[in-house]
Swiss-Prot record:
Annotated gene: SNRNP70
Binding partners and assembly: Component of the U1 snRNP. The U1 snRNP is composed of the U1 snRNA and the 7 core Sm proteins SNRPB, SNRPD1, SNRPD2, SNRPD3, SNRPE, SNRPF and SNRPG that assemble in a heptameric protein ring on the Sm site of the small nuclear RNA to form the core snRNP, and at least three U1 snRNP-specific proteins SNRNP70/U1-70K, SNRPA/U1-A and SNRPC/U1-C. Interacts with SCNM1. Found in a pre-mRNA splicing complex with SFRS4, SFRS5, SNRNP70, SNRPA1, SRRM1 and SRRM2. Found in a pre-mRNA exonic splicing enhancer (ESE) complex with SNRNP70, SNRPA1, SRRM1 and TRA2B/SFRS10.
Entry GO MF terms: mRNA binding; RNA binding; U1 snRNA binding; U1 snRNP binding
In-chain residues carrying the UniProt-annotated modification N6-acetyllysine: 118
Cited PANTHER family: U1 SMALL NUCLEAR RIBONUCLEOPROTEIN 70 KD, U1 SMALL NUCLEAR RIBONUCLEOPROTEIN 70 KDA
Species per Swiss-Prot/TrEMBL record: Homo sapiens
Keywords carried by this UniProt record: Acetylation, Isopeptide bond, mRNA processing, Nucleus, Phosphoprotein, Ribonucleoprotein, RNA-binding, Ubl conjugation
Name recorded for this polypeptide: U1 small nuclear ribonucleoprotein 70 kDa
PROSITE patterns linked to this entry: RRM
Other notes: Major ribonucleoprotein antigen recognized by the sera from patients with autoimmune diseases, such as systemic lupus erythematosus.
GO CC terms, sorted: nuclear speck; nucleoplasm; nucleus; spliceosomal complex; U1 snRNP; U2-type prespliceosome
Sites of Phosphotyrosine modification: 126
Bias kind Basic and acidic residues: ranges: 60-79, 207-254, 269-286, 294-310, 343-393
Length: 437
């Protein structure tokens, strides 16, 4: 279909001109001709040097030997510098050391951001301060982390020396000591090979791990020929740390056991309380049933007694008729027409009824006293009392009169409720007459 396009569009589809041919700059590898062919090194062997005439090989320095050499050179150079500075060091003629040396306190390990006003606020609590000198680097002008504080009174310096050591200022615990440069004869600072610290004495086998005023003083003042006393101190410190850890573990276990015992006792108390409440509810239900049955029995006995009294009055009015029929309670054939068994039988009925009422009253009082004793024993938590109460309650259930199962308080209450003439207090709802002689 392109042949039907107009000429201007057909010109766009026309092919380009071919790439012009250029001759190569070099010949191809197979076209090259070598004038001199390859040969070996045999003709040149006679030009080599004789091995017998070669110089001996030079021994190169290894990496370990180079490091040891540099360390040795550094130590020698540092010793020379220390000897030179020792000749120039004189703390008594130092222009920066001013004031009384026995009133000056040395404070180290100070935070680099701590200012002089902050140090003054922290150390003024021990006494009035005369001057504070913070040490700065001469080259960079930055603080070096220690200062000298001069107090107006020597006693204030001693107080700060005792109580300010280990005080945390701006997140760092400072170390407090007296100024030893002008007070101790032959004293040398740490940079000149002296000082009290044992953390920079050498390698890991010589340095101590923990630094501080007390530890370093013990390190320097410890007598004995031991070449490495810090090992004994580290061993003692590790032993003390293990003992403290064991004591903390024992105390923690003791607290856990006490808490478990408290929980166990509380659970046992709750269980005992639930058991006693169930027993108390059962006793109350039993007492309620007993009272209802007693009330019904009492009403029945009252009706029977009224019927007997009513029937007994008819027998006494007509003795001739009563002689033919024997009474209900007495044996047949014993009562005559004029015999005195009728009034005696009534007296026995009254005595029997009185004993029954006394027994019911005693049982009611005994139940009430039992509940009261149970509550008392629950509050006291005495097992012996509870065991004695159970024995008393079990032993008093089979008695007829019910007084042996009662305590002294219950027996006294029962005696107080009974009158001097044989009458009981009107708690039963009616008064009982005394039995005839």
């Amino acid at each position: 279909m392109t042949q039907f396009l107009p000429p201007n569009l057909l010109a766009l589809f026309a092919p380009r001109d071919p790439i012009p041919y250029l001759p190569p700059l070099e010949k191809l590898p197979h076209e090259k001709h070598h004038n001199q062919p390859y040969c070996g090194i045999a003709p040149y062997i006679r030009e080599f040097e004789d091995p017998r005439d070669a110089p001996p090989p030079t021994r190169a320095e290894t990496r370990e030997e180079r490091m040891e050499r540099k360390r040795r050179e550094k130590i020698e150079r540092r010793q020379q510098e220390v000897e030179t500075e020792l000749k120039m060091w004189d703390p008594h003629n130092d222009p920066n050391a001013q004031g009384d040396a026995f009133k000056t306190l040395f404070v180290a390990r100070v935070n680099y951001d701590t200012t002089e006003s902050k140090l003054r606020r922290e150390f003024e609590v021990y006494g009035p301060i005369k001057r504070i000198h913070m040490v700065y680097s001469k080259r960079s002008g930055k603080p070096r982390g220690y200062a000298f504080i001069e107090y107006e009174h020597e006693r204030d310096m001693h107080s700060a020396y005792k109580h300010a050591d280990g005080k945390k200022i701006d997140g760092r615990r400072v170390l407090v000591d007296v100024e030893r440069g002008r007070t101790v004869k032959g004293w040398r600072p740490r940079r000149l090979g002296g000082g009290l610290g044992g953390t920079r004495r050498g390698g890991a086998d010589v340095n101590i791990r923990h630094s501080g005023r007390d530890d370093t003083s013990r390190y320097d003042e410890r007598p004995g020929p031991s070449p490495l006393p810090h090992r004994d101190r580290d061993r003692d410190r590790e032993r003390e740390r293990r003992e403290r850890s064991r004591e903390r573990d024992k105390e923690r276990e003791r607290r856990r056991s006490r808490s478990r015992d408290r929980r166990r006792r509380s659970r046992s108390r709750d269980k005992e309380e639930r058991r006693r409440s169930r027993e108390r509810s059962k006793d109350k239900d039993r007492d309620r049933k007993r009272r209802s049955s007693r009330s019904r029995e009492r009403a029945r006995r009252e009706r029977e007694r009224k019927e007997e009294l009513r029937g007994g009055g008819g027998d006494m009015a007509e003795p001739s008729e009563a002689g033919d029929a024997p009474p209900d309670d007495g044996p047949p054939g014993e009562l005559g027409p004029d015999g005195p068994d009728g009034p005696e039988e009534k007296g026995r009925d009254r005595d029997r009824e009185r004993r029954r009422s006394h027994r019911s009253e005693r049982e009611r009082r005994r139940d009430r006293d039992r509940d009261r004793d149970r509550d008392r024993e629950h509050k006291r938590g005495e097992r012996g009392s509870e065991r004695g109460r159970d024995e008393a309650r079990g032993g008093g259930g089979g008695q007829d009169n019910g007084l042996e199962g009662l305590g002294n308080d219950s027996r006294d209450m029962y005696m107080e409720s009974e009158g001097g003439d044989g009458y009981l207090a009107p708690e039963n709802g009616y008064l009982m007459e005394a039995a005839p002689e």
